[in-house]
């Protein structure tokens, strides 16, 4: 599971309504959206990344505390879930047609980067001797093809390094059904 994939994409690629298709980077873009060809400003940080950075940091802190016995696990689990929804709403708002501060190119760019990241992760998985069973939005289910494959922890680190987005192992299953 990629950790807060869409908000991390907005931060990593500076996606914000005022940074999409800017005039200052039109002819020499440093960041181009895969499959779409949109360019993103690299001269200044957008409002969305600026606002999302502290929220995302707070969510990760609360999530870590929700797994630590020294803290009230239930309280921090609820708090990190609340911040998760705030972050998801920020993504959804970028694609809302009547949004005062939205732009469909932001929404399209976030999902394009997400597809690209998922495909890169799948390539990494297969190169490491695993098979991809299923992948959707921000998650991959994989299984080793043979014994002697690298550990799942090492695999998640490789994917994180290659994509620039942290991947966490959410579980291990003896069997699974996809409907």
Set out the residue ranges of the language-model regions.
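Conserved acidic
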Residues: 2-179
